[in-house]
Amino acid sequence: FKHYLVAYLNCSLAQKLVARRTSGNAQPKLNVGDMCLIPIPTFSDAFYKVISNLIINSENLIAASQEKYRYAEKMLVSTIDMVDRSSTKIITSLKSLSESFLTSGRLDAEYYQPIYDDYKAALKTEDTVYTLCNLYDKNFVPKDDVEYAYIELANVGNSGDINDVDSVLGKNLPSRARRKVKSGQVIIASVEGSLQSCALITDEYSGALCSTGFYVVDSDYINPESLLVLFKSKPIQALLKQRCSGTILTAITKDEFLSMPLPKIEQSVQKQIATKVQESFALRHQSEQLLENAKRAVEIAIELGEEKAMKWLKGKNAEV
């Protein structure tokens, strides 16, 4: 029954009932007591079992997707020294003026922590984001009467996927929605605390808009999937964090981003990473489809009856 409950509470009908019970202005919330008053339609055990199987299969596909992505990360680790250096015993660093401010323009002590020097040494590269990547930072002005898929920070998943993107009329878009993306590009969040929010733009979101809070890049030397895994790797994430600056909103500037070290990856390894990431994304898409089928089946059962819902699900299974 618990899996059916998950499907029901996520379907559009239940969400409307939840919204109706939500109260408050500055911080709308749903009280436990109000949640208990939301009606739950009941059906046969056979229907519950079908919905449960869909949810369980969806969870299994997500687990398989995550495993594929972890394998891609391991492929990258095999070519780059990514030993965990967070436990380094050296916590002090002495730098002369010529080695510090006159070179980097930075006076904050955090920037010169030895751990960052360790990561730079581990990458063993003279290349940077500037030499290996193309940066797309030209503003796009949306048309008022055209709908655009708008990718926000909250739409970026842990494995570099994008989901739950809303379509918004150009006139209703926020002023920061000024980057138009295309398939094969990678977006990287620029604000400290969200640097791990990197995503690969797939065909589904080609032509979408994203916030100016993302850097949009691709590369002539590194395929999109490998670029995604690289930017989400521990050394690159550490170097992104090192280069952040600011007071109210700490972020990495364009100059700091472009000058950040970035290693090349062997073509044979890139191909293997690309295959695993593509497989991961495909499995995640299948998982999402099963969840949608479960939610839609519950909606049909409520609106038209359980028999109609079961028939609809059989048709969906026949399509697979």
Give residue ranges: language-model regions.
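Well-ordered mid-protein domain cores that form the structural environment of catalytic cofactors
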Residues: L5-T22, P39, K232-P235
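Short coil/turn segments at secondary-structure boundaries
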Residues: R20-T22, S87-I91, P142-E152, Q242-C244
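Non-catalytic DNA-recognition/assembly elements of restriction-modification systems
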Residues: S44-P142, E266-V320
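Sequence-specific dsDNA recognition surfaces
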Residues: Y130-N139, A154-S183
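Short amphipathic C-terminal alpha-helix that caps PH/PH-like domains
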Residues: L5-C11, L54-S58, A72, L227-K232, ...
